[in-house]
């Protein structure tokens, strides 16, 4: 499982011209799920993301987490995070988990986040979405639960 975590001033996701999720400040998380991902991957990433100290403290140092600043969270499924571009010009998505299995893990990820935060904004799994992100910093991090990078 891998994520792209972005500290944002605001972020929103639209499906068919309707805003289905939006936040004013916090973290935008793009979530990719691959074959072999389990509950352990979810637990690792939720703990890591919610505890990341990437918000500034009173001295301007990145020292506070999303929980510390009472920020909001927007999670969007993104199978293309497992696009393999090493051969040819067209990405291969063979490692990405699809269908109901991936949806179940995505929903479990959201559930774990909600257990800590109470409320979580989200995209629509499998939908064609328009995502607007106003980066803050910018601060953008990639995390892989298998610690590939």
Curated annotation (Swiss-Prot):
Keyword annotations from UniProtKB, A to Z: Cytoplasm, Hydrolase, RNA-binding, tRNA-binding
Entry function: An aminoacyl-tRNA editing enzyme that deacylates mischarged D-aminoacyl-tRNAs. Also deacylates mischarged glycyl-tRNA(Ala), protecting cells against glycine mischarging by AlaRS. Acts via tRNA-based rather than protein-based catalysis; rejects L-amino acids rather than detecting D-amino acids in the active site. By recycling D-aminoacyl-tRNA to D-amino acids and free tRNA molecules, this enzyme counteracts the toxicity associated with the formation of D-aminoacyl-tRNA entities in vivo and helps enforce protein L-homochirality.
Main location: cytoplasm
Domain of life: Bacteria
Native organism: Clostridium tetani (strain Massachusetts / E88)
Pfam families tied to this protein: Tyr_Deacylase (PF02580)
Comment, domains: A Gly-cisPro motif from one monomer fits into the active site of the other monomer to allow specific chiral rejection of L-amino acids.
Subcellular location: Cytoplasm
EC number: 3.1.1.96
Sample GO molecular function, one term: D-tyrosyl-tRNA(Tyr) deacylase activity
Residue ranges annotated as motif Gly-cisPro motif, important for rejection of L-amino acids: 137-138
Catalytic function, reaction form: glycyl-tRNA(Ala) + H2O = tRNA(Ala) + glycine + H(+); a D-aminoacyl-tRNA + H2O = a tRNA + a D-alpha-amino acid + H(+)
Subunit: Homodimer.
Keyword presence, Magnesium: no
GO biological process, one term: D-amino acid catabolic process
Name of the protein in its database record: D-aminoacyl-tRNA deacylase
NCBIfam families for the chain: D-aminoacyl-tRNA deacylase (TIGR00256)
Coiled coil location: none
Broad class of enzyme this protein falls into: hydrolase
GO-annotated cellular components: cytoplasm
């Amino acid at each position: 499982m891998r994520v792209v975590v972005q500290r944002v001033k605001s972020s929103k996701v639209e499906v068919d011209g309707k805003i289905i999720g939006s936040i004013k400040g916090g973290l935008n998380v793009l979530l990719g799920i691959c074959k072999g991902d389990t509950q352990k991957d979810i637990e690792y990433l939720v703990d890591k993301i919610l505890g990341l100290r990437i918000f500034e403290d009173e001295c301007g140092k990145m020292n506070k987490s999303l929980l510390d600043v009472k920020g909001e969270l927007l999670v969007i499924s993104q199978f293309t995070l497992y696009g393999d571009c090493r051969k040819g010009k067209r990405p291969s998505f063979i490692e990405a988990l699809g269908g109901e299995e991936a949806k179940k893990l995505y929903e479990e990820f959201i559930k774990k986040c909600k257990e800590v935060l109470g409320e979580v904004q989200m995209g629509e799994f499998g939908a064609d979405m328009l995502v607007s992100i106003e980066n803050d910093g910018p601060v953008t991090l990639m995390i892989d639960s298998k610690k590939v990078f």
